[in-house]
Design a protein with these regions (language model features):
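Sec-dependent signal peptide recognition
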Residues: 2-8, 22
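C-terminal motif of bacterial Sec signal peptides marking the signal peptidase cleavage site
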Residues: 13-16
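Short, low-complexity, disordered segments immediately C-terminal to signal peptides
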Residues: 18-33
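Local sequence-structure signature of Cys/Sec-based thiol-disulfide redox active-site neighborhoods
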Residues: 36-68
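Thiol-based oxidoreductase modules, predominantly thioredoxin-like and allied folds used
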Residues: 74-90
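Structural micro-motif
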Residues: 96-109
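Non-catalytic, surface beta->alpha helical segment in thiol-disulfide oxidoreductase systems
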Residues: 107-148
């Protein structure tokens, strides 16, 4: 009985995180190509239609950290925070690019025409809800390292 309840809870939890796919759009590809011309760091928070408490904490705490610590960089465009709903057709290209199928957090650095991405999803799920200050501090340190 306990195994059935545990299994059901696990399945519902994973479903709530939004195991969705999206459709293709050339508009997103054009926008991505234009954005790659400027040196910058992007914080990309991906999500589906349904989000669990941890998924929502990732967005909330990531956005709070970025807005509190990087106001000047947000204004001058050297840092960008994007929320991307992977259940929308126009976001399929970017979701495919980073192989995202559920809630995820990436840091992407564009420097001299080259792109490097760091997947922080495991770190975010481990800390955003249960240790938000640790999450914010770690995210801030990672972003500072990429902005240098």
């Amino acid at each position: 009985m306990n195994n059935i309840v545990l299994t059901l809870a696990l399945v519902l939890g994973l479903t709530a995180c939004g195991n969705n796919t999206a459709k293709n759009s050339s508009g997103t590809e054009r926008q991505t190509a234009q954005n790659e011309k400027q040196n910058r760091v992007e914080v990309l928070y991906f999500h589906g239609k349904q989000r669990c408490a941890t998924c929502m904490a990732i967005k909330k705490n990531a956005k709070e950290a970025v807005e509190a610590q990087f106001e000047e960089q947000l204004k001058n465009g050297s840092l960008v925070f994007k929320t991307i709903d992977i259940s929308k057709e126009e976001n399929e290209a970017i979701a495919d690019k980073y192989e995202v199928t559920w809630s995820s957090l990436f840091l992407v650095r564009y420097q001299s025409g080259k792109e490097s991405a760091e997947n922080l999803t495991k770190y975010a799920f481990a800390n955003a809800r249960t240790a938000p200050d640790t999450f914010k501090q770690g995210l801030t340190e990672k972003i500072n390292g990429l902005l240098d």
